Structure formats: structure tokens, C-alpha cells
């Protein structure tokens, strides 16, 4: 009975470790998208933060 218990614990640990490693790839992809969005926001023209300038220059601010 103790052997069965050890096998269950081992299987659970291995399964958990494998699933955690798989989620690391998804987390990395999400982090890349977030950093791209931050970089895009940081590159915006300062004019875009002023409502008057923003409305006068839609080609710059989108």
C-alpha cells in the first residue's frame, strides 16, 4: 500500500512539473506582447498626449 502511495506522489509531482514547464512558454509569449505594447506606447509622439494637438494630427496619433 505504501508503494502505491509513493507512485501516486511521484506521478503527481512529475505531472505538475511538466505542466508548469509548458505554461512557461505561454507566459513568455504574453510577456513579449506586453513589452511590445509598452514599447509602442513609449514611442508615441508627445503631441498625442495633448488633446488639441492629437485632434489636429490624426496621422501621427492614429
From Swiss-Prot:
Keywords: Acetylcholine receptor inhibiting toxin, Amidation, Disulfide bond, Hydroxylation, Ion channel impairing toxin, Neurotoxin, Postsynaptic neurotoxin, Secreted, Signal, Toxin. GO terms for molecular function: acetylcholine receptor inhibitor activity; ion channel regulator activity; toxin activity. GO terms for biological process: venom-mediated perturbation of G protein-coupled receptor signaling in another organism. It is found in: Secreted. GO terms for cellular component: extracellular region; host cell postsynaptic membrane. Disulfide bonds join 47-53, 48-61. Alpha-conotoxins act on postsynaptic membranes, they bind to the nicotinic acetylcholine receptors (nAChR) and thus inhibit them. Probable competitive antagonist of fish muscle acetylcholine receptor. Inhibits postsynaptic nicotinic acetylcholine receptors (nAChRs) from zebrafish (IC(50)=58-100 nM). Blocks mammalian nAChR composed of alpha-1/gamma and alpha-1/delta subunits. Blocks central nervous system nAChR composed of alpha-4-beta-2/CHRNA4-CHRNB2 subunits and peripheral nervous system nAChR composed of alpha-3-beta-4/CHRNA3-CHRNB4 subunits. This is Alpha-conotoxin EI.
